[in-house]
Structures are given as structure tokens and as C-alpha cells.
Amino acid sequence: MRIVIAIITGLLLFLGAWLFNQESSNNDTEVKQEQTTVDTTAWIIDVTANLDGERIVNADDEPGNWLAHGRTYDEQRFSPLDQITTDNVGDLGLAWYFDTGTDRGLEASPIVVDGIMYTSGSWSVVFANDARTGELIWQFDPKVPKAWGVNACCDVVNRGVSVWKGRVYVGTIDGRLIALDAATGEVAWDVNTIDKTKPYTITGAPRIINDKVIIGNGGAEYGVRGYVTAYDTATGEQVWRFYTVPGNPSEPFESPAMKDAAKTWTGRWWTMGGGGTVWDSMAYDPDLNYLYIGVGNGSPWNQNIRSPGGGDNLFLSSVVALNPDTGDYIWHYQTTPGDTWDYTATQHMILAELEIGGELRKVIMQAPKNGFFYVLDRVTGEFISAEEYIPMTWATHVDPESGRPVESDNARYQVANPLLDLPLKEQVAVLAAMTAEEIEAAYHKPGPLGGHNWHPMSYSPDTGYVYIPALDMPFGYGNEPEFTYEQGRWNLANDWRLGMPTGDQGVDDKVDGLLRGFISAWDPVVQKEVWRIQHAGTWNGGMLSTHGNLIFQGNSSGQFVAYRADTGEELWSAPAQTGVIAPPISFEIDGEQYVTVVAGWGGAFALTAAAAEGYNLKPRGRILTYKLEGKVELPPVVDIAAVLPEPPPIDATDEEIKHGKFMYHKYCGVCHGPGVRSGGVLPDLRYMASGKHIVFEDIVLGGILQDRGMVSFASSLTKEDSRAVHQYVISEAHRLKSRSGN
């Protein structure tokens, strides 16, 4: 019998390796060009060659285009177009759709230049389409090695490209910055922006200022040091680099700003990176020539480990103003001093001029993760005002004199949860006796996904409102017992047990019901919510405002929706057949206004928590474009119902399964979902076929699926750990089968 099993196992290993190697990635790039006429190529060259800063600064002179990430340098995401209005938006229909061929999250904001649309998909693939018809002009695949995906905390997403003087610029998930010919997709240059021995990623869209393409990176969950870099758009040569947190103080500081920042840190933070990655938001004021960057969380999250003597830990969780020509520091404002909750300030920033106290002020507005909506003077960095836009427990208010948050008594999580010392059955009994409100009160708010995540807000100068795609999600923070830093793994120093489902359906349903998402229409002058649209789901899309008194947003329920901008009344919706998380844009061709959104379920919530909402949304990657009287229909969805295979018998003690549950949530849950409940992006391990169970150890420790992104965890897990994880997964498969019947 052992010989038979050995033969079967060997055959499965051989077949698995052969099959997966057929789709393995390499570092070679690939351009797919469709047949285009000489006239089309010449047209693209003509309309993109003169796309520069002057055109973006004067974008309102050509409102039919969407020339930059937020349409304009001020990132308001407001379209002056008004052919589509509250009166006729009900006549909106699909003009065209384009299948991206991707099955991971899509977060990009497209660029449209005189009828040519440029956007990006998962794995940093770039598409050029005819914006009138959706016809593909060219497609570029940077061939990111799939194994690099393990370094991406929050899916292998990309938030868009930039176009400048005949070239398209994209950052890749493996840390490269690439310039492409806008007409052909051919590579002009390709530079590495990171230390490849460290788990950096790029998911944010580049910004271009004064012939410099500026890019940040991510990776603070793993243990890296953040920075933002400017490269020459023509040559790809590095012009400057600004580090956001200090390095080893025994070595020369890169700038006076780093020397000053180091005074706000303690301990040996640099051995764990420190964090502070600039993974998303930037804005630019051309009159001041100030670049604004949003800086992320500490690495590890827990300040007790990162900087045990406390301190503000600059420039974590800060808005920083830089000179875009030199990278020199100008000013900063820190939203969360001494961050210990993953309260990044990388969220969308909007520039505007507001009348405050009878004076017209140049302001920068942000709703970062920490739950306060900030209005700052963008000339000086002076604090103007802040009010909470979601319920929170970590702080009571922001002191108007100092501009610093006033932390509540239980803000920092030194005290361990007493429930963790009880056996699981007793934990369940205590929680089952509590109401949902009592359970919610025991958590911290907001959680690490924040009151607002990366999804862009929008601002309407017509209504004066900022539209926030907000989140209300509690979370359990606590010191991780015996934390040890692990290179290339998640290093939070937060107790993973606090986020583990109990396995009791009633208790877990109560906790799942605490996750909420909504649109908040916010008046930034009086710092007050005007109205709110409560969503059925939590993880919803970015915002678009238009001069037609409309706002548009996709949602996690798989709908793309238009609302009145002044009142929030829903006026129109269309099925997207997948969750929508990207922000819409609007443009005009030949006198017709279009609205486009890139649709594809994914991202951090989809990986880690989406199963809680019960949606069975697949990441069907598409570009969806609408216009008045559009007549195109999406093809019907054909979903094959998943059948739960008969799981192998459980072969472990309760103590082994308990250990497997802990190790699963520490190393596996961030991708495959808490409680082995997938959010629809990556495989639900409860549904593993029998062959996968046979080679489970070869997958987890041997890395036979590395070319598909499932790398070996042999550096973190022993054979006993792997077996315990496997038994926990099997136990959850049995639990599901007994509950559902199949």
C-alpha cells in the first residue's frame, strides 16, 4: 500500500510541476499589439507627445480628457462635464466592455487622452484601448514572477499609469518602474527602484511633475524602510530620493530631515525596517511647486516593539510637503503620532481653496485611516481643523492648539484579552452571552483597514462636499506573545489570536455583522456629515463627482451606481457582475460624455474578510464604459456551483488542531481568509481536492506551486506545523460539510 501511495504521490508531484510550469512567469516582458493602421499610430503619437505639465495644469480647458490620476494635479476627481445629469442619468447604458483576462483585484483609475484610454490591471499589466469602442490597441505584460506576489500584503493590484510626452509609465508589483511607448507599448526604459533582497512592492500610480516621474512603494507589514523616488522621464535616471523614516543612526543621515526624525525614535527600529512606505496618495500644487506625499504605518505595527521608548516616530502617518525638483523637505503634519494601529496617512489627499472664517485658504484635505477628517493649510502645514467621520475608540478629539490627537485611556493595547486564557468552549460561551453591541464595544475602532482606505474620495466645487467611501470595522489589537521578527513574513507584533473566528456560527455571525461601509457626504468647512448612504457591504469603490450634480461609485454587491450629489438619492444602477473597488472617471468624445470604471473584485478586504459578508463575487476583470442610450449588454454569468469534496478524516488531537489554527492565521489567513473562508479571490482551502491533500506538505514546505505564487513556507513552518495547519483546514472542511450538507 505504501508503494502505491508513493507512486501516486510522485505522479501527482510530476504532473503538478509540469502543469504549473506551463504557466510560469519569467522576467521577460511581453507586448501584445493588435492590428492598427498607420493613421491610428500617428494619431496616438500626435495626441500624447504634447501631454505635459502645462496641459495638466490647464486641464479644465479640455474637460473631455482625463489627463492625470485625479484628472488634475489637485486630485479632486471632479469632472466638469454635464451632458449626463440628474434628469437623464436613468438613460445611461453600457457603451462597451473589455475583458482584461485577469482574476485578481482591479483598482486602476484610467487615463484618457483624446480618445485613447490607458489603464492597468493586476500583476501590473498595462492596456491601451480605443476609448470610443473598447478595442484593444496594445497590451503590455511586465512578466512579474508570480512568487513575488507573496510580498504584496493586499493583492497584486495596480492603481494606474501616468502618461507624459508620448510615453506611459507604470510601477510593477516587483518594484520596477517602466516607461512604454504610448503608441506601441514597446519598452523605452525599465529601472529597478528597490532592494530586491527585501519584500518591497509597488501598487500605486506614478505621478509626473516637471519631467520627473515620482514613485513610492509598499511593504511595511513585512519590515521595510519607506521612501519616494524621482526619475528622469526621458532616461530613467534617478534624480532624488526622500526617505520617510530614519535608518541606522550610526551611519550618516541622508538629509537634515532624517537627522531630526531620528530624535523621535527609540530602540533598534532600523533592524525591522521602520516602515513609512508611500504606497498610494500624492498631490501637487503647481503655484507653490509643492509635492505632497502620504506616509504609511510603522513596521512592525506595535510601537512597543518598534520603538519601545515611545516617541512620535516621524514621518510615520504623516502628510509631508517636498520640493519636487530636489526632494527637499518643506513641512509635515503627523496625523497619528507614535502609530501603533496601522493608521496610515497614505489615503487620498485633495487640494482646494475654501473660505474658512471669512478667509480664502489654500487647503489640503484628507480622511486617513485614523478616523479624523483633516483640513490643513497646504502652504505652511498649519492645522486648521479635524473632526471624526466614523465612530472611534482610540482618541476623543484633536486638540485645536497643538493639532495632536488626544488618545483615550484604552487606546494602546498593552493589556491582554482575558478571554485568550480560557479554553475555546469557555470563550464561545462568554461571547455567545454577549450582545453584538457588547462585543463591538470590546474592540478597537477603527481597525487596520481604517475609516477610509485607498479608495479615492472626490470633491464637488458645486456642492462643496467631499464624498468619502468610508468603513466602520472594529478590530482586536494586543501584544503578540514572544514576537520574533521574520524576514519576508508579516511582522505586526499584534496577537493573531484576537482575529481568529471562534468556529461557533452564532458568535461569528455577530462579529461579521459589525462590518459596515457607507458614503459620507462631508462638509469640510463646518466639519460635519451632511448625509450618508449605508451600503450592504463594506469594501466599496472610489468616488467620482460631476458637474451634472452626480456622484458615481461601484460597490461590493456588484453594482455600479449613480446618486444625486446634493442629496444622495440613488438615481441609476447597473450590474457589474463583480465587486467594484476602483474609482470611476468621465470623459467626452465627439460630443458624447462617457463614464468608465474598471471592475474586478479583490484587494485587502477581499482576501482577509470578505467571506463575512456572504457574497459569492468572482474577480471578473473588465473595463466598463457607459453613455446615454448605450445598448450593449454583458454576457450572462455562468457560475459552476462549487461542490465540497469529501474531506479526509481528521487525524489530530484538539491541541494539535488548536496549534494549527494559530499557525494558519499567522501565515495563511491573510490570503486564504480567516477561518479558512475565502473572500473569492484566492482558493478556499476547504474545497481542496483529494490530490491536493496528498501533496499538502509538498505545496506548503516544498514550494511546488511557487510558479503560481504559492511559495514555500519551510523557513517559518516545521513539518509538525504544516501537519497541524492541514488538520485544522480539514476540520473546517468537516465543519462546513456538517453545516451545509455539502
Regions inferred by a protein language model and the residue ranges of each:
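Repeat-blade elements of multi-bladed beta-propeller folds
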Residues: 66-70, 105-125, 150-176, 201-222, ...
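C-terminal capping alpha-helices of c-type cytochrome domains
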Residues: 171, 714-742
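Short, conserved, GDST-rich strand-edge loop motifs in beta-rich repeat architectures
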Residues: 215-226, 266, 293-313, 473-512, ...
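Conserved blade-ending motifs and adjacent loop-strand segments that build the rim/top face
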Residues: 338-340, 345-348, 390-394, 445-447, ...
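Blade-level signature of beta-propeller repeat domains, shared across WD40, Kelch, NHL, RCC1
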Residues: 585-641
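Gly/Gly-Pro-rich "capping" loops immediately C-terminal to redox-active cysteine motifs
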Residues: 661, 673-705, 711-712
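Aromatic (tryptophan-biased) beta-strands that constitute blades/sheets of beta-rich domains
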Residues: 32-100, 135-149, 186-195, 237-245, ...
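Electrostatic cytochrome c docking/interface patches
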Residues: 44, 54, 639-663
